[in-house]
């Protein structure tokens, strides 16, 4: 129970950090540069999570030193915040969570955020089960998940550039189509010693990770200056809903229909 409580508390803190970061960032950029700004931000975020994932193979998760290192990293991140002289964005007098705000500003963005959450959470949480059922070894499962995150990190800025150059709605549509083809292609993969399973994981991450960035940029295109915090919180709320539901459905489908059911669900 103590572990569950701490996990809930850490989730609340992380959600708060993302809300502040994204609302501040969205308030400081223009519609012409919003996609690239979100792409750069998400590249740093995704690449850092990849490094953290790889550190699991170096550090012992159950050891005290691992948590000390994490605490030091969190403390170090406070330095640029405390030293900055940039004025914070405008906020409403009494900000609150308003999921309807995101729906009113851009229903497409809400749909995109849900798709990004479902695909990402299902792969990250249920991907190890999928890897084990198709015959991957423990270290291969780690590389399998890392290929997914690495593909997502590399896609962020190029897709952000496309979202600034072309209509963000069409970028979202083509990303979704590419994600569907990537999911369908992944159905036939098996651990036959080839690189195909890792290439497909890379491609799946490349097509699904940037959906959130483009969707968030599209929603903020229509937001007023005093709505940034509430809109960012609302988008993260929908992301959390998708991230909670996806692993539950994906794990159940895998149990009934086999490992390929995860990609069928995402498609």
Stretch-by-stretch model annotation:
Residues 58-73, 252-267:
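A membrane-interface helix-boundary motif in multi-pass transporters
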Residues 31-41, 138, 223-235:
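Loop-to-transmembrane helix entry/capping segments in MFS-fold secondary transporters
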Residues 16-29, 209-223:
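Intracellular juxtamembrane helix-capping segments at the cytosolic ends
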Residues 10-43:
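Cytoplasmic helix-loop-helix junction between adjacent transmembrane helices
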Residues 71, 170-185:
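Structural signature of the two symmetry-related core transmembrane helices
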Residues 71-91:
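C-terminal membrane-cytosol helix-exit motif in multi-pass small-molecule transporters
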Residues 109-112, 121-130, 134, 141:
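Helix-loop boundary and gating motifs at the non-cytosolic
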Residues 60, 155-167, 254:
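Helix-to-loop junctions at the C-terminal end of transmembrane segments
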């Amino acid at each position: 129970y103590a572990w569950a409580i701490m996990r809930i508390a850490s989730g609340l803190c992380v959600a708060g950090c993302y809300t502040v970061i994204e609302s501040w960032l969205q308030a400081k950029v223009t519609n012409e540069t919003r996609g690239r700004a979100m792409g750069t931000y998400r590249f740093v975020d995704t690449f850092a999570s990849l490094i953290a994932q790889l550190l699991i193979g170096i550090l012992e998760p159950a050891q005290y030193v691992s948590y000390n290192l994490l605490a030091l990293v969190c403390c170090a991140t406070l330095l640029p915040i405390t030293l900055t002289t940039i004025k914070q964005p405008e906020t409403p007098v009494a900000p609150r969570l308003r999921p309807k705000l995101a729906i009113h500003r851009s229903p497409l963005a809400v749909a995109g955020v849900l798709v990004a959450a479902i695909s990402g959470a299902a792969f990250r949480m249920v991907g190890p089960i999928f890897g084990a059922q198709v015959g991957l070894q423990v270290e291969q499962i780690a590389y399998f998940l890392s290929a997914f995150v690495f593909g997502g990190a590399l896609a962020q800025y190029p897709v952000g550039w496309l979202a600034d150059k072309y209509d963000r709605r069409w970028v979202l549509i083509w990303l979704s189509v590419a994600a569907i083809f990537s999911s369908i292609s992944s159905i036939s993969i098996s651990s036959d010693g080839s690189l195909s399973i890792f290439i497909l994981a890379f491609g799946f991450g490349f097509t699904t990770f940037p959906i959130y960035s483009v969707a968030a940029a599209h929603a903020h295109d229509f937001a007023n200056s005093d709505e940034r915090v509430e809109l960012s919180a609302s988008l993260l709320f929908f992301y959390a809903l998708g991230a909670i539901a996806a692993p539950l459905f994906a794990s159940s489908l895998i149990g009934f229909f086999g490992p390929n059911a995860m990609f069928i669900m995402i498609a």
